[in-house]
UniProtKB/Swiss-Prot annotation:
Family annotation (NCBIfam families): PRK13731.1
Subcellular location: Cell outer membrane
Signal peptide: 1-20
Entry's Gene Ontology cellular component terms: cell outer membrane
Residues covalently joined to lipid (N-palmitoyl cysteine): 21
Protein topology in the membrane: Lipid-anchor
Organism, scientific name: Salmonella typhimurium
Gene name of the encoded protein: traT
Designated name of the protein: TraT complement resistance protein
Length: 243
């Protein structure tokens, strides 16, 4: 009986320690804010003496990004360009739209989130195993085993790896001396089973390029209020560095 109790105490103690390992590891590794920005496509342009830019920033996400245009304009000006209010007077057009700025789970692709949850789940499972082994005190042992699992779950709940992602589509238009012909094709839905193909052709004096900028902010227990300024800063630098 004493040996069984000793083994039970040892197992429960080990469970309590292991259940908090995932949370402790997360807290240590993710204690500092990490920000990464990537662009889906590279935009190349020939060097020219013209250094005027017309900037248009839209936001179709559900987050407030009212300061974003001024931040981007400031970084563009820091590179020696003049931001103008009239598109007709600009050599470059930069148009950006924030599609989404929200919490996104990137840990599944990295295989990191699943390891974090194993601590709590193993505690609950081990509690059931102890109950089966110690049949003489099943009720008491079940309570201890469940408590071990709940401690692990509580620790994991208090320490959460949070990642916020901002997705922005960018279109760059560059004036050219050549005549540019653009063919537009659009498929318009007609009800649930049909579609209408709409085509048009236009001529102009601009080459247009499109890319997507994805910015991530990652930290333990991160709040959007903390992530927002660094996400905006990274996006502004990325767009300005196109020029």
């Amino acid at each position: 009986m004493k040996m069984k109790k000793l083994m039970m105490v040892t197992l429960v103690s080990s469970t309590l320690a292991l259940s908090g390992c995932g949370a402790m590891s997360t807290a240590i590794k993710k204690r500092n804010l990490e920000v990464k920005t990537q662009m889906s496509q590279t935009y190349w342009h020939d060097p020219v003496s013209e250094r005027t830019v017309w900037l248009q920033v839209k936001n179709t996400s559900d987050k407030d990004m009212s300061d974003l245009q001024s931040l981007i304009a400031k970084d563009i000006q820091a590179k020696g360009y003049t931001v103008v209010t009239s598109p007709d007077k600009a050599y470059y057009w930069i148009q950006a739209n924030v599609l989404k700025a929200d919490k996104m789970d990137l840990r599944e692709s990295q295989g990191w989130l699943n390891r974090g949850y194993e601590g709590a789940l193993s505690g609950a499972a081990l509690g059931a195993g102890i109950t089966a082994y110690n049949s003489n005190s099943a009720g008491a042992t079940l309570g201890v085993g469940l408590a071990a699992g709940l401690v692990g779950m509580a620790a994991d709940a208090m320490v959460e790896d949070i990642n916020y992602t901002m997705i922005t589509d960018v279109q760059i238009s560059e004036r050219t001396k050549a005549t540019v012909t653009t063919d537009n094709v659009a498929a318009l839905r007609q009800g649930t089973s049909g579609a209408k193909i709409q085509t048009s052709t236009e001529t102009g004096n601009q080459h247009k390029y499109q890319t997507r900028v994805v910015s991530n902010a990652n930290k333990v227990n991160l709040k959007f209020e903390e992530a927002k300024p660094v996400l905006e800063e990274q996006l502004a630098k990325s767009i300005a560095n196109i020029l």
